Swiss-Prot record:
Keyword Cell membrane appears in the UniProt entry: no
Keywords, sorted A to Z: Carbohydrate metabolism, Glycogen biosynthesis, Glycogen metabolism, Glycosyltransferase, Transferase
The protein's annotated pathway: Glycan biosynthesis; glycogen biosynthesis
Catalytic activity annotation: Transfers a segment of a (1->4)-alpha-D-glucan chain to a primary hydroxy group in a similar glucan chain
Family: Belongs to the glycosyl hydrolase 13 family. GlgB subfamily.
Active site, renumbered: 422, 475
Protein name (database record): 1,4-alpha-glucan branching enzyme GlgB 1
Source organism: Xanthomonas oryzae pv. oryzae (strain MAFF 311018)
Enzyme class of the recorded protein, top EC level: transferase
Biological process terms in GO annotation: glycogen biosynthetic process
Amino acid sequence: MSERQGGQEQDREADGVTTEGISEMSQTLQALADGLPVDAFAVLGPHPLADGRRQVRVLAPGAEAMGLIDSRGKLLARMQASAIDGVFEGILSIEGPYRLRIVWPDMVQEIEDPYAFAVTLDESLLLQIAAGDGQALRRALGAQHVQCGEVPGVRFAVWAPHAQRVAVVGDFNGWDVRRHPMRQRIGGFWELFLPRVEAGPRYKYAVTAADGRVLLKADPVARQTELPPATASVVPGTDTFAWTDAAWMAKRDPSAVPAPLSIYEVHAASWRRDGHNQPLDWPTLAEQLIPYVQQLRFTHIELLPITEHPFGGSWGYQPLGLYAPTARHGSPDGFAQFVDACHRAGIGVILDWVSAHFPDDAHGLAQFDGAALYEHADPREGMHRDWNTLIYNYGRPEVTAYLLGSALEWIDHYHLDGLRVDAVASMLYRDYGRAEGEWVPNAHGGRENLEAVAFLRQLNREIAAHFPGVLTIAEESTAWPGVTAAISDGGLGFTHKWNMGWMHDTLSYMQRDPAERAHHHSQLTFGLVYAFDERFVLPISHDEVVHGTGGLLGQMPGDDWRRFANLRAYLALMWAHPGDKLLFMGAEFGQWADWNHDQSLDWHLLEGARHRGVQLLVGDLNATLRRTPALYRGTHRAKGFDWSVADDARNSVLAFIRHDPDGGGVPLLAVSNLTAQPLHDYGVGVPRAGAWREILNTDSAHYGGSNLGNSGRLATEPMGMHGHAQRLRLTLPPLATIYLQAEK
């Protein structure tokens, strides 16, 4: 050994590094430079030497030169390019922080070293997520703006327990999968703080699966995304939106007297479109939609899913970005502005929220870390054959934390007033849409999905605890008992449930020729057998006007006059019937055609007087609902309803009384004649003597009808009828519903 070689060996030994260690380190650095699974924090960044100095290593493929500088830009040490491409090494003789000065071919960058920072995620948060805590997941995962000491930046964090390696790639590192490998934490979580990253860059995670495949995945907890069909996540802005809806939020009290609930269901991308047939942005929607909803006196807007989704033709019901508003309408702040404007206008906002399934797009949740993670591994549990989508594994706490965190995020961050949970029936039953042998029984041998039941209860429990007064509405199409019953009583704890049975029965009845209706009268009356078993919403939703059925008006029988008359009579019957109301956009003015998600509603139809008449009627129905306690205070209580005429199938007449069960206000009588013949001198029993006034008549010329009615005011006769002490003798116009109210 030469004298020089001996000196080199002594230097290395003084630094605490042996020849064998150098060889091992070279292999590690080579693996790191090749993007292979290596503990990056074990080799990159500053590491103490035996003599008190620090060795600094940086991986910067493509850099031409590098130095270490202080906060004022003074050079502290020059970094040497090692034999391994992209790896720079240097010795730092002073204590304290340092920055990197990196010379790239087209720029000089001065930045802190990401690998000089300690962990930024509290281990307790990770343990809480592993126990199913959605609030902890909201605080921990995704791209979060944080400050490490005096250095601002973004902490990226993701759950990928089967991964060998995870790296952040994006606009800030040239999408180079080698540059920024993340730190592995307990429970399969990965994190990395990138200093000085601001809002706006696109990013993804490069996930190395157990078999070595590198998967480019969007962030499951991204708060912002780029515009589809592009699939990257976007670093969001800081949470600085200035809300002005304090008065609205303060009155959202579940203990208050029941209020009217009338929901206008909207697909934001097709309610109206711009001159280039593109969806409106949130500010434009606010300018146009909010005054329209105010004009029609709806209490709430319900948005079809606006969580980010790759395929517009799914209407939003196959989402992948459960924490991000779709970029189709602009920025997340734009959506916040929309909700804020709704609240200032006195309108609540409900979001359709999908926790039943997700699509299998390569950039999404499917096989997120190379293995079944969010979904079940067994397709008998993990795949919806009806929709070719994947089912969440509700038995995995991290998955339920992900879903719970999403629900809480929308309610908290965007001040939403309710969630309508989609496809609940598909969650509750393991054999939903499956033949014998295509599903796996639960632990007790049954068909119920016990894990999904537990998740739904936890969802409703947490929303009620953290955000009292927020609605949770189940789209549940079976007879599962107690959907809206208290969890303590064995129920699921939803505030409301869609009444799919009422919708199917009554629509089927209305689609029949009036001459045939006498034989199907029970389709009108059967819903009252169970109307008070749950807190129901009566839904005429988007599902009723697609797949060739035509619009609601187009489904009515007869010539044009009869179609309009049928529609008006049906809507007024619906508004008088027990249950809260939901109407999909377009039905309020009588759209003829199927709803088309790729174009605007047929607003030109409002040039026709009959279409304007339907629109005027809907506004008047909502106004009547708002000012009539008998129509809403007892809408979920049997004490608020009495039959007058339930059995006149021959004349297709239905008549009932609505009361305020708490004794306020005056009763309302609703009578529907669903034949094409007027009925004169028709006796109907009522509970109160004196004058009754016709307050609404769908056959009014005001709405496009023949203007047959009861001249405003009638007096009762002291003759018992239909179980009531008094009766009214009425003129019932054809294909019409009338409301009469006792005078005080």
